[in-house]
């Protein structure tokens, strides 16, 4: 899984062997120069197709190694949750959903406490679509409670997987 370092856009590539599925916003896919420069270069280095299957943030999708339902994505044993305008956690649940990664995207008001009230998060990822001043607030709040984090503004994040 690769979370690309892109300004104003979100792109997560789920790679298995020579196949890959790209989770991306429609604005990114319409931005040919960003796709050519930022995505195709990475795909070329990994000998991946320049034409992956693309799924949107509002789409549900399932195949033999990836499942996306609403804001949750299961990829070969890892669980990723999205935190954006469309998806946040319901306060009505009486348990914390365990997730490996929680990806904050778009202009979300920094509220790490709400995140940890709803999710048992191993790592918070602050995406490049989050404005810099908000990203700094998310990171400072994560530091304050000892929550591991990664700021995509520092570069792409690649997580290896062991395929079973």
Where are the regions that the model predicts?
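Hydrophobic alpha-helical transmembrane segments in integral membrane proteins
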Residues: 1-11, 17
């Amino acid at each position: 899984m690769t979370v690309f370092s892109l300004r104003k856009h979100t792109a997560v590539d789920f790679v298995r062997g020579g196949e890959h599925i790209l989770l991306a916003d429609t604005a990114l896919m319409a931005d040919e120069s960003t796709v050519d420069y930022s995505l195709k270069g990475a795909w070329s280095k990994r000998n991946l197709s320049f034409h992956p299957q693309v799924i949107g943030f509002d789409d549900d999708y399932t195949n033999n190694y990836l499942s996306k339902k609403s804001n949750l994505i299961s990829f070969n044993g890892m669980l990723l949750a999205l935190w954006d305008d469309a998806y946040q956690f319901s306060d009505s649940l009486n348990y914390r959903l365990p997730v490996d990664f929680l990806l904050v995207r778009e202009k979300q008001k920094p509220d790490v406490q709400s995140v940890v009230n709803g999710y048992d998060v191993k790592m918070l990822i602050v995406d490049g679509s989050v404005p810099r001043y908000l990203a700094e607030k998310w990171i400072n709040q994560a530091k304050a409670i000892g929550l591991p984090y990664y700021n995509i503004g520092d570069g792409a994040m690649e997580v290896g997987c062991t395929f079973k």
